[in-house]
Amino acid sequence: MPRLSAIATGGGGCFIVRVRVLIIGCGYVGLPLGVQLLRQGHAVFGLRRSAEGAAIVQRAGLQPIVADVTRPGDLAGLPLPFDWIANTISSGKGGAPAYQKVYFDGTRNLLRRLADSPPQKFIHTGSTSVYGQADASEVVETSPAEPASPTGRILLASEQLLLDAFHEKQFPAVLLRVAAIYGPGRGHHLLQYLKGVAEIPGQGERFLNMIHLDDVVGAIIAALQNGRPGEIYNLADDEPVPQIVFFRWLSATLGRPMPPFVPESAAVSAGRRGDTNKRVVNRKLKTELGYSFRYPTFRQGCAAEIQRLKEASLL
């Protein structure tokens, strides 16, 4: 089965390298990623756990695979080899037990299945929740990763499986630590505000680290193309923002009142990413991978989402 192939794009002798790509967990992030890669001329396979999910993948024009990474037997049927693999899987709900099965056990199962037929690049999407800093400090990829939550510790252990595989067997893993994703139908603080149930913990000084879905997709593609195996990259936009600033902007933009202030311990939004307070730095993503953000801050991204909702008569 061929892996790399070239596609002629005209008489000028220009060629695009066509690769076989597998997207694991082809859902909120993985599906638009697959569509974008398909538009670039690649052969894209999307893995989902159910036949219903696979049907969504097929309707998007991708080649569906039904398998569950928590079941080693399911992975035996993967049509290996692939040039690129992007693991964008989500645990859904279920807390730490689900994280253990999907992220840690799933990663271990994938490494075992790919041992004899590794890809040229393997992208793992984790979370900035592995950073437990609570002092509003800046965090870069080399900052201490001491998660404050059980799920954060599981995510860190899953990363370590991949780093060990890189150091011991040169497995081409690139690790992405993704901030809170927002976009169509997603974005905890934005959606809470639009529903009228948002609350501001304390004085609203805790920082939010966010990234728009479109930029997650773009950054993953940049990592597939240029990411260095064994390296970690933070995926967050240019502006970590205090909650008070975020909600003031929404209030002014929409002409709605500010959310109420509540004690930190009673906040509805508390605990989404542990009791952390940090400013995630994306410098390495931009300088090393050359990524340019479509939505550099929450202002551009939330404005686009608000406009989308208005055009759909949902706001």
Model-inferred region functions:
Residues A219-I220, N226-A270, L315:
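Mid/C-terminal beta-alpha module of Rossmann-like enzyme folds, strongest
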Residues R248, A267-S292:
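Conserved C-terminal active-site "lid" loop/helix of NAD(P)H-dependent oxidoreductases
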Residues L191-I211:
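A conserved pocket-lining segment of Rossmann-fold NAD(P)-dependent short-chain dehydrogenase/reductase
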Residues N109-P150:
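Conserved Rossmann-fold NAD(P)-dependent oxidoreductase catalytic core, especially the SDR/UDP-sugar
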Residues L156, E168-F171, I181-L191, P201, ...:
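Glycine/proline-rich active-site loop of Rossmann-fold NAD(P)-dependent oxidoreductases
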Residues P81-I123:
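NAD(P)-cofactor binding segment of oxidoreductase domains
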Residues D135-L175:
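Catalytic helix-loop patch of NAD(P)-dependent Rossmann-fold dehydrogenases
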Residues T297-L315:
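Amphipathic terminal alpha-helices
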